[in-house]
Amino acid sequence: QEITGFELQLVGTLTDKWFISAGYTDTDAKKTDGSPLREVPESMFSIWNNYLVTDKLALNLGVINQGESHIKDQASPKLPSFTRVDAGANYALTENTTLGLNIENLTDELYFPHSHSTHQASVGAPINAMLSISSSF
């Protein structure tokens, strides 16, 4: 098999309140006979933003895009590309305790992130939320 491609990642602070992380991967994955490898997306992109609204409240927004990938080690069928939007908020209740809310798949996109075999594809989770409290001591 032969896998070629490249990956880029940028991570940084745009302002004293805005942190961003972005990445892109482009992949060409083939078996020695030239047929594509299964479950290797042609491209992937992600970006995550964290913005500090106040000294206690932070808002988060992220986007993940995954290109088409093959279900089998053959030219077809393919898992379709998808884009998922996630969001969240964190609030510092005390210096050591944070309340968090994360919402995954904000647009309730129907997507298929991977396949389990040559004839089954997994359905991505519909819109869902998680409330958490974390504490350090």
Language-model features: locations:
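Surface-exposed coil/turn segments at beta-strand junctions on protein surfaces, enriched
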Residues: 13-15, 52, 80, 92, ...
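C-terminal beta-signal and adjacent terminal beta-strands/loops
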Residues: 68-72, 90-137
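Residues that define the transmembrane beta-barrel architecture of outer-membrane proteins
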Residues: 2-4, 41-45, 81-85, 125-129
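Gram-negative outer-membrane beta-barrel transporters
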Residues: 1-73, 107, 134
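A subset of signal/propeptide-processing and intrinsically disordered low-complexity segments
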Residues: 2, 50, 62, 81, ...
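Flexible, surface-exposed loop regions and adjacent strand-edge segments
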Residues: 36-42, 76-80, 116-123
